[in-house]
């Protein structure tokens, strides 16, 4: 929950920066995450295939993906999971 909430907040903040009203930005971000999660669960597709299916060559989505990669998004997400796991282990001992 917290990781996805932070991602939703960041998506909405980006949209607000581009001029979208806050209420619409939050709703659109939530709809995007919900729709993608539903597709992942229902289709059984690998998430890489889902990403590739919506990234047109030279398009807007791949530009956004590139920005996420440059910012270390994937690494930060992995580090968050590992940190939470390590904290769980520490609390058990």
Task: For each feature predicted by the language model, list its residue ranges.
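Helix N-cap / loop-to-helix initiation motif
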Residues: 21-25, 46
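A short glycine-threonine-serine/GTX helix/turn-capping micro-motif
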Residues: 1-2, 23, 51
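NAD(P)-dependent Rossmann-like dehydrogenase/reductase catalytic/cofactor-binding core
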Residues: 30-93
């Amino acid at each position: 929950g917290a990781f996805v909430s932070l991602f939703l907040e960041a998506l909405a903040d980006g949209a607000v920066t581009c001029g979208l009203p806050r209420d619409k930005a939050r709703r659109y971000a939530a709809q995007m995450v919900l729709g993608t999660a539903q597709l992942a669960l229902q289709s059984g597709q690998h998430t890489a295939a889902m990403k590739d299916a919506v990234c047109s060559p030279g398009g807007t989505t791949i530009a956004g993906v590139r920005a996420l990669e440059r910012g270390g998004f994937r690494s930060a997400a992995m580090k968050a999971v590992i940190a939470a796991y390590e904290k769980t282990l520490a609390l058990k001992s």
